[in-house]
Regions:
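Extended, amphipathic alpha-helical stalk segments that mediate dimerization
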Residues: 1-18, 26-96
Length: 96
């Protein structure tokens, strides 16, 4: 499965770079649906609130840590297989 997770990481990187190009969104949706049929979900926590109690991501904090932290960049997505996190997301977090 490790190779499959690497494919998901690459697909997620492409998706984040092509987010504004709507003609590609249909293909990404089809890929996600295929993974879901195999019991694998992946998501990007971009712009979500961050707290140190989150267990689904590993964060690198830039700037000063505050009580209002937000995920500003996703290096790797969170991958969940059959309800269990198999890859924690790697993210950059900034204080607001």
């Amino acid at each position: 499965m490790k190779h499959l997770y690497e494919v998901i990481n690459q697909l997620s990187a492409l998706e984040s770079r092509l987010v504004e190009k709507e003609e590609f969104q249909r293909y990404f949706a089809r890929c996600k649906q295929s993974f879901e049929e195999m019991g694998i979900l992946y998501y990007s926590p971009l712009h979500e609130k961050y707290s140190e109690t989150r267990t689904d991501v590993e964060a690198n904090i830039t700037g000063t840590a505050t009580s209002s932290m937000v995920i500003t960049q996703v290096i790797k997505p969170v991958i969940v297989e059959n309800g269990a996190i198999v890859q924690r997301g790697i993210v950059i977090v900034e204080g607001k």
